[in-house]
C-alpha cells in the first residue's frame, strides 16, 4: 500500500488485483462495464518465461485501476467501501465456479500479489524489481498456513477494507471465531481457507465496526489474565471488553504483523512470545 512508481498517480482509484485466465478477463470486463466502471490504468504482469519449479503457469497477474461509476457520486465513504467489498466478493465467487479468476483485493492504493513457490524465484519470475512497481508500505510473507491444502486464498497476507495482517502462530479457537464473524452480517467476513485470516477480520471488526483503536485489538485477541486486569488502571473497561468479546480470543502462540489504512505498521504477540517477530 501507499503506492509509488507508475501507480502513484492513481491513488484515489480502486485497484483490482488478482490472477486471471483470458476467459476470466472477458468475464471481468463484462461485469465491470455493467456496473459502470471504466478502466483507468493497467499494470498487468505477463511472463513468457518458464515458471519456477512448483509454481503453476498462469495467464495474467492483473493489476488494474478503475474510475468509479457516475452513479456512485454523492455516496458516503462507508457506502463506497462496502460496495467495493461486495464487488470483490462477487468476482471471487464467479472465479471459484470455473477457476477463471482469483481476486485478492479491490481497493484504492493497494495491490496484492500471491503465488506458490520459492519466494526469491517467484519474485524474479514475476519481475517484482521492475521500476514501475513500488510502494512505501509492503507486507510480505513466504509461507501459508500448513494445516490446509495449498490455495492462494490461504496465503498471507490477508486484506479487508484497508486493514491487512500476516501471522505466524496457532489458532485452535478458529471455529468459534469464524462463527462469530460470519454472524455479523458483513459481506467481507467470508472465505476462511486459513485460520490466520481471522486475525485480519478481527482487526477490521475492532477498528471499523467497533471504532476502537489498535491497542484494543491487542486486548481483544490476547487479553490480560484476570489477576493482571485487577492491577490495570482501566480494569473495569478491559474486563467488560474481555468478557463481551470472549469469542474473539486467539488460543495459541502467535505473532501478528499488519498495517492500517493510515499506513501504521504494527506487531502484536501473545504474552509468552513463542513466535518471534524478529
Segments from the language model and where they lie:
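Conserved short alpha-helical segments that host acidic/polar catalytic motifs at enzyme active sites
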Residues: 1-278
Amino acid at each position: 500500500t501507499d503506492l509509488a512508481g507508475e501507480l502513484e498517480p492513481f491513488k484515489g482509484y480502486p485497484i483490482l488485483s488478482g490472477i486471471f485466465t483470458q476467459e476470466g478477463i472477458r468475464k471481468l470486463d463484462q461485469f465491470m462495464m455493467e456496473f459502470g466502471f471504466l478502466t483507468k490504468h493497467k499494470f498487468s504482469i505477463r511472463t513468457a518465461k518458464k515458471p519456477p519449479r512448483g509454481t503453476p503457469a498462469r495467464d495474467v497477474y492483473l493489476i488494474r485501476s478503475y474510475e468509479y461509476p457516475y452513479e456512485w457520486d454523492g455516496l458516503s465513504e462507508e457506502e463506497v467501501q462496502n460496495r467495493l467489498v461486495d464487488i470483490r466478493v462477487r468476482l471471487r465467487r464467479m472465479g471459484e465456479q470455473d477457476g477463471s479468476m482469483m481476486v485478492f483485493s479491490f481497493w484504492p492504493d493497494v495491490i496484492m500479489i500471491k503465488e506458490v513457490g520459492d519466494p526469491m524465484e517467484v519474485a524474479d519470475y514475476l519481475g517484482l524489481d521492475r521500476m514501475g512497481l513500488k510502494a512505501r508500505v509492503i507486507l510480505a510473507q513466504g509461507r501459508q498456513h500448513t494445516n490446509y491444502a495449498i490455495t492462494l486464498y490461504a496465503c498471507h497476507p490477508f486484506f479487508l477494507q484497508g486493514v491487512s495482517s500476516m501471522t505466524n502462530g496457532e489458532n485452535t479457537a478458529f471455529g468459534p471465531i469464524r462463527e462469530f464473524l460470519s454472524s455479523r452480517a458483513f459481506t467481507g467476513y467470508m472465505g476462511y481457507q486459513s485460520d490466520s485470516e481471522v486475525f485480519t477480520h478481527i482487526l477490521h471488526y475492532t477498528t471499523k465496526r467497533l471504532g476502537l483503536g489498535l491497542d484494543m485489538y491487542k486486548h481483544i485477541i490476547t487479553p490480560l489474565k484476570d489477576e493482571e486486569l485487577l492491577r490495570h488502571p482501566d480494569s473495569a473497561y478491559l474486563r467488560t471488553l474481555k468478557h463481551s468479546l470472549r469469542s474473539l480470543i486467539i488460543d495459541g502462540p502467535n505473532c501478528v504483523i499488519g498495517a492500517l489504512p493510515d499506513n501504521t505498521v504494527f506487531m502484536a504477540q501473545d504474552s509468552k512470545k513463542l513466535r518471534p517477530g524478529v
